[in-house]
Amino acid sequence: MLRTMLKSKIHRATVTQADLHYVGSVTVDQDLLDAADLLPGEQVAIVDVTNGARLETYVIPGRRGSGVIGINGAAAHLVHPGDLVILIAYGQLEDAQARGYQPRIVHVDSGNRIVDLNADAATAAPGTAGAPVPNPLADSLA
């Protein structure tokens, strides 16, 4: 049986540009692609932390060291410069391999510079997490 598992994640990157008229895809600094083990053309999900939008596209390499995260094509209607995003890639692994697999997790700062690598996928790197969103139903659940 194959399991679809988290393979790569670039956490809380800042969108630096958007080009509605580009053919499509997301442009990502080559340093971030290398750190996250993402290849040009690889499918990624983009989760917009700022507005909740989710979409799928593929990556194209951007200039190394530039910090570029560029949203291209129709996705520019959903994701805008300055938005915080999470880029996620999944892989299919055999059950035994999946049980021991460690994904590549890349935490970045506001300039999209790497601040932490291969941390626990469920733990934010120091200084990268925002304030928790309050649960509006918390009082009624108590």
Curated annotation (Swiss-Prot):
HAMAP family: PanD (MF_00446). The gene is panD. The active site is at residues 25, 58. Belongs to the PanD family. Its main location: cytoplasm. It comes from Salinispora tropica (strain ATCC BAA-916 / DSM 44818 / JCM 13857 / NBRC 105044 / CNB-440). Pathway: Cofactor biosynthesis; (R)-pantothenate biosynthesis; beta-alanine from L-aspartate: step 1/1. InterPro entries: Asp_de-COase-like_dom_sf, Asp_decarbox. GO terms for cellular component: cytosol. This is Aspartate 1-decarboxylase. It is found in: Cytoplasm. The modification Pyruvic acid (Ser) is found at residue 25. It catalyses: L-aspartate + H(+) = beta-alanine + CO2. Keywords: Autocatalytic cleavage, Cytoplasm, Decarboxylase, Lyase, Pantothenate biosynthesis, Pyruvate, Schiff base, Zymogen.
